[in-house]
């Protein structure tokens, strides 16, 4: 099945959504890898666009202007996060659930309610920012002189919320190609508009440039969203109330989860700061950022298709458990070698991305990498709770993780300094895995497949071996061990990914190259 479904009529939406979910295992793996490649490629291009935009704006605006841009951008992000009440995430779930029924009318109703709720929340968010512009200006800049500029940011909040909801519609229907294009072309159009404004008006265009970037994203998302055919329906009040209640109920749980994550991260940093000072806080920040950089990229790329796909199958326990196992296995195969490499080259990575002064954070980074490896394992399981729409259980598990994370940091930082914060991060994910597995087992009868368990064992042993080598052996021996483990895990991952994706579907030139490297194998039995 194409990652970009060709939906030419409302009936086609329903037909695609209700198509039998049981497919050959190799097709499932190929779908995962294709969607990951699409979203990952678009994300990489977005990063390039963002870097170019930042570079150009830095040259045009200078440090002060760029700092002003960052402050205004933070205001937009804060108000947007609060105002949209999590519907950007719950919208994906509701659209995917409607699509999973194969009912074209229900899809149209859910999409219509999502659009109306997002417009209402966008207007409320913009109004909130206008009303609070004076105190926000005083809080941020020390005076109310920039209140009018802060008020103008309300337009950016409105466009962002509308854009997010249209993206949720596209993602929920699993139009992954369109979803990737929305991200890239929205960023490109917004960046070109913002740069043009700054070229003409300089620092005075900082706020208009943020509005232009948001408007560009909204315009592109609207263009692709309007291509999705929908049945014509007239919404009844009872339907609006039911759909909006479900949308906002789960959305609030997502928002609460985000606040818990931010609060726990803030709490850990505050503990490190109070106990060891600013330098230690900087070491932990560097380790935490780099530890999650590659894993975050992989999981974000994979989640764009995995989440709506799982929602559509969530009432079929056997199929949904198969999908979670497939996703977990591919996640480990993609992220595992990266974790082994980061563990091995921790000091070098810190020096390259920051400076040689951050070398002391290497051990903290290794502890964070252990936690991130566990995160890769638990991440697909957690989606079972989210896909079921159980906001209470979702909130409880997130709250438990946050409390354990801060509690462990409070106990360990006093003894081990910033390294203790890394240990706490790892310990929190050990707790998360032990908590999550029995929960999802009771919900859907989930258990690891033999193939997934083998991948967990292989990469668990690999990462643990590299970590222990740096704890027990001289640096030279540890580096040699890490290099060998990274090489071996990379070869293993490539062979497994090629086997799962069925090499016969690759271009002939690629098959010949793989054959020369003796990595060519047949698809799964």
Language-model features and meaning:
Residues 4-32, 221-265, 308-319, 444-456, ...:
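Interhelical loop/hinge segments that connect adjacent transmembrane helices in multipass membrane
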Residues 30-46, 72, 77, 81-134, ...:
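Membrane-water interface segments that mark the loop-to-transmembrane alpha-helix transition
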Residues 2-23, 468-525:
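Membrane-proximal transmembrane or re-entrant/amphipathic helices at the cytosolic face
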Residues 147, 151, 180-229, 286-288, ...:
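Hydrophobic alpha-helical transmembrane segments
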Residues 158-183, 369-400, 442, 449:
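Membrane-interface junctions at transmembrane-helix termini in multi-pass inner-membrane proteins
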């Amino acid at each position: 099945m194409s990652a970009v479904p060709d939906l030419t009529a409302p009936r086609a939406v329903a037909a695609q959504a209700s198509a039998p979910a049981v497919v050959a295992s190799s097709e499932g793996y190929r779908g995962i890898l294709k969607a990951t490649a699409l979203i990952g490629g678009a994300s990489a291009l977005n990063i390039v666009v963002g870097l170019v935009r930042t570079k150009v704006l830095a040259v045009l605006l200078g440090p002060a202007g760029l700092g002003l841009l960052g402050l205004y951008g933070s205001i937009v992000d804060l108000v947007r996060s609060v105002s949209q009440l999590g519907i950007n995430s719950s919208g994906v779930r509701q659209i995917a659930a409607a699509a999973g029924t194969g009912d074209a009318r229900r899809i149209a109703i859910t999409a219509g309610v999502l659009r109306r709720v997002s417009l209402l929340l966008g207007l409320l968010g913009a109004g909130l920012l206008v009303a609070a512009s004076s105190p926000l200006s005083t809080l941020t800049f020390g005076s109310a002189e920039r209140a009018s500029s802060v008020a103008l940011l309300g337009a950016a909040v409105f466009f962002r919320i509308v854009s997010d909801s249209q993206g949720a519609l596209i993602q929920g229907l699993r139009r992954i190609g369109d979803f990737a294009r929305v991200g890239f072309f929205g960023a490109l159009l917004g960046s070109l508009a913002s740069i043009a404004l700054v070229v003409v008006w300089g620092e005075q265009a900082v706020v208009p440039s943020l509005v232009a970037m948001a408007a560009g994203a909204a315009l592109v998302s609207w263009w692709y969203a309007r291509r999705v055919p929908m049945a014509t329906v007239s919404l009844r009040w009872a339907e609006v109330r039911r759909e909006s209640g479900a949308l906002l109920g789960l959305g609030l749980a997502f928002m609460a989860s985000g606040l818990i994550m931010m609060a726990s991260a803030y709490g850990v940093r505050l503990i490190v700061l109070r106990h060891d000072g600013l330098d230690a806080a900087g070491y932990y920040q560097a380790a935490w950022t780099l530890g999650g950089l590659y894993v975050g990229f992989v999981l974000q790329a994979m989640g764009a298709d995995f989440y709506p796909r799982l929602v559509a199958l969530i009432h079929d326990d056997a199929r949904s458990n198969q999908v979670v196992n497939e996703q977990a296995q591919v996640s480990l195969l993609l992220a595992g070698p990266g974790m082994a490499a980061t563990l091995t080259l921790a000091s070098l990575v810190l020096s390259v991305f920051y400076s040689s002064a951050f070398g002391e954070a290497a051990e903290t980074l290794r502890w964070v990498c252990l936690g991130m490896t566990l995160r890769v394992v638990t991440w697909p399981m957690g989606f079972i709770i989210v896909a079921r729409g159980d906001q209470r259980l979702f909130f409880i598990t997130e709250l438990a993780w946050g409390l354990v994370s801060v509690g462990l940091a409070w106990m360990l930082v006093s003894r081990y300094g910033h390294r203790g914060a890394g240990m706490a991060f790892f310990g929190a994910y050990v707790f998360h895995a032990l908590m999550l597995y029995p929960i999802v087992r009771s919900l859907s009868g989930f258990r690891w497949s033999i193939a997934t368990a083998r991948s967990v064992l292989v990469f668990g042993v690999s990462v643990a071996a590299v970590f222990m080598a740096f704890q027990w052996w001289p640096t030279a021996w540890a580096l040699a061990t890490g290099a060998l483990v990274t090489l071996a895990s990379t070869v293993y991952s490539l062979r497994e990914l090629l086997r799962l994706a069925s090499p016969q579907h690759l271009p002939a030139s690629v098959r010949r190259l793989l054959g020369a490297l003796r990595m060519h194998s047949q698809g799964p039995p």
